[in-house]
Amino acid sequence: MEQEARVLRAAGGFGRARRLLASASWVPCIVLGLVLSSEELLTAQPAPHCRPDPTLLPPALRALRGPALLDAAIPRLGPTRAPAEALGVLSPSYLAPLTRAPRPSSWASCSGAAAGPTWNLVCGDGWKVPLEQVSHLLGWLLGCVILGAGCDRFGRRAVFVASLVLTTGLGASEALAASFPTLLVLRLLHGGTLAGALLALYLARLELCDPPHRLAFSMGAGLFSVVGTLLLPGLAALVQDWRLLQGLGALMSGLLLLFWGFPALFPESPCWLLATGQVARARKILWRFAEASGVGPGDSSLEENSLATELTMLSARSPQPRYHSPLGLLRTRVTWRNGLILGFSSLVGGGIRASFRRSLAPQVPTFYLPYFLEAGLEAAALVFLLLTADCCGRRPVLLLGTMVTGLASLLLLAGAQYLPGWTVLFLSVLGLLASRAVSALSSLFAAEVFPTVIRGAGLGLVLGAGFLGQAAGPLDTLHGRQGFFLQQVVFASLAVLALLCVLLLPESRSRGLPQSLQDADRLRRSPLLRGRPRQDHLPLLPPSNSYWAGHTPEQH
C-alpha cells in the first residue's frame, strides 16, 4: 500500500487534474438521481374514487344517466335511508352497485393520448404496482452484486460505459413496452444497469480523492443526486406522460454516454490499475496527471523518488496483472466481518424507512409533500455527515445514527396510538433523517475498509443489502399489509442489534485506502473515545538522599 501511495504522490497528489475529474463526476449524479427517483413517481397511486357501474344495477335502472344513475347506485344506509358518501373507499358490504373508478395512475393516460396500451393499476389490479417495485429493486440488488464484481475484473470505466449503453437502450425500450410483463422485465434490467453505472462512478470518484477530501466529494455527489430528485416533478409536469418521461431519461443517459464516455472525462482508476499490477496502463494516466499538476515525471525530491522511478520499481515487482475473486473475502480475518456489519447496517437503514413512511402518511396525505420532504431529509443527512464524519470519525457518527433510528422506531412502535400527532410526525421525520444518514455512511465506510482489489464486489454487497431492505415495504404491500406490524418489530430489533455490531468496526478516517487483502486486514478496531495521553508513572517511593547527592537537577 505504501508504494502505491508514493506513486500517487509523485504524480502530483490530489492536484488540479484529479480535483477537476472528481468534481466533474458530480454531474452524472444529477441524471442518475433523476432516473432513480422516477420509480416513486411512476408507481404513485391515485386517490380512490367510486363510480356507478350500470352492469351491477337491476335491468330497469341500467338506462339511467348522469345524476339519476348516481342517485340510483349510491347505497342507502341506516333506518333513514341516507345516501352514502360517493367518494372515497366504501366498505365491502356497501360496494355492490359501485366500483372504484380505474383512475389513471402514472402508467395510464386519462385522455388515451399515450402511444400504445395502458394498464389499470388500481382496484383488482393494484398488485401490479408493488410487484413492479419489487422487480425494480431486485434489479438494483443484482446489478450491485454482479456489476460490482465486474468493476474488480474489467475496471471501473468499462463497467460505467457498458452500463450507460444498456441504460439508454433499456430506458427507450420501457417507453415502447407493449405489455405489463415486458415492462416488468425491462424495469428489472434497467435497475441493474443503473446500479452498475452508479457503483462504478462512486468507486472511481472515491479512488481519485486523497483521505482529507473523500468525504467532501462523496457527500457532494449525493447532494447533486438530490438535485436530480427535485427536478423530476417539474419534468413530469412538463411532459405530462410517463412514456415521454422514460424517453427523456433515456435521452439524458445517452448524453452522459456522449460526454463521459471519453477517457478525458472518465479515465480508468489508476488506484485499481496499480493494485492489480497493470502498471503500463497506469503509467499513461499518471503521467497526464503529473503534467496537469505541473510535476515532471522525472522530477524527484530528497524525500521521494520520481514518478518514473516508482513506476519502474512497481513494474519489476508485478509483471502480470493480478485479479482477485470476491470469494477471497472469506479467507480474510477481519475484512469479512467489517463487510458483514456494514451490510447489516445498510439493510436496517433501507428497510426501516417503510415504517417511518407509514407513520408519516396520515400526517401528510398528499404525494408531493412527502416526496419533497424525503428529498430534503436526504440532503440534510448528507450535510450532517459532511459536518461530523470527519471531525468525530465514521464509527461514532454511524453509532449515533443507528441509535437514533432504533430509538425513533421503538417509540413509534410502542406509543403511536397514544402520542399526539406532532410527536408522531417528529419521530417519523427524525427516523427518516437518521436512516438516510446510516445508509449513506455505511456505503462510504464500506468503500474505505474494503481493499481496492475487491472493493467493487464488497461495496456492491453492502449497497445490495440496502436495496433488499427497501424491498420489504413493497413485499408487505403485495400481501395486503398484513405483516406490517411484525415487519416493524423485526427492523426495530435489528436496529438495536446493529447498534452493538457497529462497536466492532475499525476507524477509517484519515487513512489511505487499503490496496490488498492484507492491507484491509490490518485495519483494527480502535477505542471509541480517545482519552488523555498517558502520563509518565511517578515512583512509588521518593528517591534517596544518595541519589540527589550524585545528580544535579538538570541531570535528573
From Swiss-Prot:
Family annotation (Pfam families): Sugar_tr
Topology, Cytoplasmic side: 1-23, 150-157, 204-218, 268-339, 388-395, 442-448, 505-556
Region (Disordered): 524-556
Keyword terms, alphabetized: Ion transport, Membrane, Transmembrane, Transmembrane helix, Transport
Extracellular side: 45-128, 179-182, 240-246, 358-366, 417-420, 470-483
Keyword Repressor: no
Position of the signal peptide: none
InterPro entries (alphabetical): MFS_dom, MFS_sugar_transport-like, MFS_trans_sf
GO cellular component terms listed in the entry, alphabetical order: membrane
Full protein name: Putative solute carrier family 22 member 31
Species in which this protein is naturally found: Homo sapiens (Human)
